[in-house]
């Protein structure tokens, strides 16, 4: 007679979860950061706000961003002028766009991940879909199943309104799914577009301007599974450990509220200090049991919340400049893509690094909690 323990053991994988493939995509519309203030104040009919525009120009100049990709074009915004105002009701127009475009963009990245994986998409057993946009029923997870032609029996998890820390969260969830379901292959999709947050400027809400200067559109997809098939699947990273914590005294530091005007963004000035003040405690709790105390001995995959956060983390931990190089590259070339950023950075690290067996650290921050993962790096040559 089979015992319950034997059944449970048979349901679990033998080894740890691994990242088996990565795919990324963006909308085709590319926006240069140096000229964005002129465009933004013109399209929002705010050119008369000269001092505010000068402040926004300084924000963009200091952002470390060269360009971003955005679904919203000038033509779309001219057809939806309410989205260009600061407080005009516009949620219906925004929703009509995102419920179509979020899964559509997700399909592009998922297609690339499946191609790299080299296995038929019929072998996908689980789907984790994450976005800050487009709350709807049925959700973007269901729409992707239909668009992509996945099996109707794929087990789905839809994550809305998670924010910037969600890049670490989806990896943690995918790890649990892969390790507790023998043979599971988890398709993860993080699809983000700024349709819900774009709005005109306000003299009294400068943190909204910070968001307009930083956020961009992008989607990333990964496939996660344990016990990779020899000679068939090529593991890129091993997901060793995952943790999450809420920072003390951080309530209200980062907030987003869905209103008739869209998703409003609220950010306190002390966010970089909050993170840098608490980061070493989290690092010690995570790595001391592994006898790792040299933060420069790790690969870093840090979510690029903004230049001030990166600068203070680097200074607090005494990190060498190259440790956050991949993060800086993604911030420069794409801006802050919320949940998708960490997966974009994973892609950069695996493509540029020739290291083998090195511990990797992921840091994703938002709302305001930290998601921590430890990864082991596999040597892998891209064809």
Curated annotation (Swiss-Prot):
Which keywords does this Swiss-Prot/TrEMBL entry list?
Answer: Acyltransferase, Chromophore, Hydroxylation, Transferase
- According to its UniProt record, the EC number is 2.3.1.212, 2.3.1.74
Species in which this protein is naturally found: Rubus idaeus (Raspberry)
How does the record describe its quaternary structure?
Homodimer.
Specify the domain of life of the species encoding this protein. Eukaryota
Q: Which InterPro entries match?
A: Chalcone/stilbene_synt_C, Chalcone/stilbene_synt_N, Chalcone/stilbene_synthase_AS, Polyketide_synthase_type-III, Thiolase-like
Tissues in which the UniProt entry reports expression: Expressed in fruits.
Cite the PANTHER family for this sequence. Answer: CHALCONE SYNTHASE 1 (PTHR11877:SF80), HYDROXYMETHYLGLUTARYL-COA SYNTHASE (PTHR11877)
Name by which UniProt lists this protein: Polyketide synthase 4
User: What is the protein's known function?
Assistant: Bifunctional polyketide synthase producing both 4-hydroxybenzalacetone and naringenin chalcone. Can use p-coumaryl-CoA and ferulyl-CoA as substrates. Catalyzes the initial key reaction step in the biosynthesis of phenylbutanoids.
Q: Active site located where?
A: 164
pH dependence of activity: Optimum pH is approximately 8.0.
